[in-house]
């Protein structure tokens, strides 16, 4: 059994009036100086990854508050509410760009609660989303990237195996298909999107609708953390990057990924020492202890 710290459920709305729900864990003593906001990955949520549970305890023990919340793109397909009116949300149907509004809403929520120094922490596709936010906002103190991957390369490999198609060809085809749908919620076949990882633990199909996949392919996940011909960028915030040695979704060598992040993050600390997978299973305590050492330095 894994225990978490004692938190309280919170809710806040993004600019599209979608209610976002999460858990906040506040450090004792009334200190509202430091907080880490966790942004989950593709089809994830605020509680599923067990390292989140351990962070809630370990961060609090060090005087760091912690917020973990559901993006509009959480899970696959879920019921959400916009000003009390039902709307279907989730990774399979939501527009990728709304996740950036979700992050903005979370930052505004903790700022209004009195927190002064906000750190954004992303896992997997959450790394791409917080990166886009940081590149367009100047209200973040530090950045934590857990298992960032080249999503373009992952989809490129998937399409080569399952569709005999390039990402650009898929994009053009989906754009035409999207124009013909006229607002219909159109589910694609299961060979359109997925991961053909470099080990058996990371091979899976991802159900998705046309508009949602098109928004992902055209979003920041396919632009910035892209080792071949990606959009150039530079982040000058203090940044912690975790790269597990056995990450089956990393489509390049560990050395190439380390070089990439060192090039694009000017104040970067890279932890590439741990022999664990994309979800950091079995190395949670060691990772969190290392993050805290970096954070407190």
Please identify what each model-predicted range represents:
Residues 1-30:
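N-terminal cap/lid segment of alpha/beta-hydrolase-fold proteins
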Residues 12, 176-296:
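Serine-hydrolase catalytic core
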Residues 28-76, 80-84:
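Short, surface-exposed "cap/lid" segments of acyl-processing enzymes
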Residues 88-112:
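Alpha/beta-hydrolase active-site loop
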Residues 121-126, 130:
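Gly/Ala-rich beta-loop-alpha elbow adjacent to hydrolase catalytic centers
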Residues 132-136:
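Active-site signature of alpha/beta-hydrolase-fold catalytic machinery across serine-
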Residues 144-154:
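Active-site nucleophile loop of the alpha/beta-hydrolase fold
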């Amino acid at each position: 059994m894994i225990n978490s710290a004692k938190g309280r459920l919170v809710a806040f709305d993004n600019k599209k009036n979608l209610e976002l729900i999460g858990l906040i864990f506040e450090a004792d003593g009334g200190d509202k100086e430091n907080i880490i906001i966790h942004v989950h990955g593709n089809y994830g949520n605020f509680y599923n990854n067990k390292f989140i549970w351990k962070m809630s305890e370990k961060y609090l023990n060090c005087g760091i508050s912690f917020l973990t919340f559901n993006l509009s793109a959480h899970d696959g397909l879920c019921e959400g509410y916009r000003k009390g009116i039902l709307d279907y949300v989730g990774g399979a149907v939501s527009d990728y760009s709304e996740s950036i509004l979700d992050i903005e809403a979370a930052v505004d929520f903790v700022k209004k609660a009195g927190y002064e120094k906000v750190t954004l922490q992303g896992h997997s596709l959450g790394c791409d989303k917080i990166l886009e936010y940081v590149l367009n906002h100047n209200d973040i103190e530090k950045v934590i990237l857990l298992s960032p991957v080249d999503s373009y390369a992952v989809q490129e490999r998937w399409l080569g195996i399952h569709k005999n198609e390039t990402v650009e060809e898929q994009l053009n085809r989906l754009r035409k298909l999207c124009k013909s749908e006229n607002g219909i919620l159109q589910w694609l076949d299961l060979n359109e999107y997925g991961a053909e990882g470099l080990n058996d633990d990371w091979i899976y199909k991802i159900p998705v609708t046309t508009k949602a996949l098109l928004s992902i392919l055209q979003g920041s996940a396919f632009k910035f953390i892209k080792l071949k011909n990606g959009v150039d960028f530079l982040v000058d915030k203090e940044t912690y990057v975790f790269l597990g040695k056995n990450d089956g979704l990393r489509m390049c060598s560990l050395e190439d990924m380390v070089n990439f992040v060192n090039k694009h993050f000017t104040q970067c600390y890279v932890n590439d020492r741990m022999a664990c997978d994309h979800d950091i299973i079995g190395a949670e305590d060691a990772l969190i202890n290392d993050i805290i050492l970096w954070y407190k330095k």
